[in-house]
Amino acid sequence: MGKKAIQFGGGNIGRGFVAEFLHEAGYEVVFIDVVDKIIDALKSTPSYEVSEVSEEGEKTKTITNYRAINSKTNEEDVVKEIGTADVVTCAVGPNVLKFIAPVIAKGIDARTASKPVAVIACENAIGATDTLRGFIEQHTDKDRLSSMSERARFANSAIDRIVPNQPPNAGLNVRIEKFYEWTVEQTPFGEFGHPDIPAIHWVDDLKPYIERKLFTVNTGHATTAYYGHVRGKKMIADALADAEIRKIVHNVLEQTAMLITTKHEITEQEQNEYVDTIVKRMSNPFLEDNVERVGRAPLRKLSRNERFIGPASQLAEKGLPFDALLGSIEMALRFQNVPGDEESAELAKILKEMSADEATGKLTGLEKSHPLYKPVQNVVAKVQKDSK
């Protein structure tokens, strides 16, 4: 029997990043989703195209050998598929992990194969697979928990690839940047060895890769989006073509670089080269990457361990400068009532109805005693004053 991977999430990242590389590694991919439109399209279309965009032009790959199941109406089928799968991946968004966990728990529990299934969450969040595992354990009988490692092994991952807004009539086809990084920890697989997926860079310690990615790519991308939004820019490339915004982004990434190089075995030169690569990628006009797409979900992006508060809090604890990140936080707070983004409306409501003190605690999760708390509270108060 051939290799089989279960991919939760049939969206752009699921189809245009995860499934692309699973397909290239020789896996049959079974997409799981609850959106009828996506499942119906995948069922009725035997192939779709992934176009990798770079300055050299576009390279198109054809993806085949997949199936699709709606977990909302066919849960038993999903359980059976997980029962005989080699790999389970997901790209659903960190907030959705708790909703996919029950069916994955049932699927893992039903396994009888001698080799455990590899579970890898592909989300923009630190320790997403650990989070998913926690939810899965909540839906597993207590007397089965001690033997779960015989049925499943869980590995955290760091993913990095820009997927811009897609053309309106793209269907299942995905336009995506050529550059990618998919780094996964290999130690959880032990004597079984990790799955054979050539696109993955397997490492013993993932934390430096996750923090470097989140605090460089995500921090830089979101900083560009929020400053761009406030200054009326439509595209990320347009925002970075503005010399002032470009300088601000570099200043922010200089501060996060200070954290990354002091915490991890990454040299200043390595980090500087990484920053240059990231800014060049984001400046690519061929991606047609929209400022509002990158800025959406500001509540999540302002939360405690995310791209702004995460690095700024650690810098503050170490007595290192974080003022440039305060600017990013301010611009994120100004991303209010953006059409199609519920979190931006909720953000506006919080800032309108709460005091600066209450809003700071709710939005950032910072303790009042934290050295970052007061500076952020001042920024919150400033934005509230300007909004009146």
Swiss-Prot record:
Domain of life: Eukaryota
Molecular function terms, GO-annotated: mannitol-1-phosphate 5-dehydrogenase activity
Active site feature: K213
One Gene Ontology cellular component: cytosol
Keywords for the protein's UniProt record, in alphabetical order: NAD, Oxidoreductase
Positions contributing to NAD(+) binding: A5, I6, Q7, F8, G9, G10, G11, N12, I13, G14, R15, G16
Catalyzed chemical reaction(s): D-mannitol 1-phosphate + NAD(+) = beta-D-fructose 6-phosphate + NADH + H(+)
EC number: 1.1.1.17
Keyword Oxidoreductase appears in the UniProt entry: yes
The keyword Chaperone belongs to this UniProt entry's keyword annotation: no
Role description: Catalyzes the NAD(H)-dependent interconversion of D-fructose 6-phosphate and D-mannitol 1-phosphate in the mannitol metabolic pathway.
Quaternary structure and interacting proteins, as annotated: Monomer.
The family this protein is said to belong to: Belongs to the mannitol dehydrogenase family.
Protein name (Swiss-Prot/TrEMBL): Mannitol-1-phosphate 5-dehydrogenase
Organism: Neosartorya fischeri (strain ATCC 1020 / DSM 3700 / CBS 544.65 / FGSC A1164 / JCM 1740 / NRRL 181 / WB 181) (Aspergillus fischerianus)
Lineage: Eukaryota, Fungi, Dikarya, Ascomycota, Pezizomycotina
Originating gene: mpdA
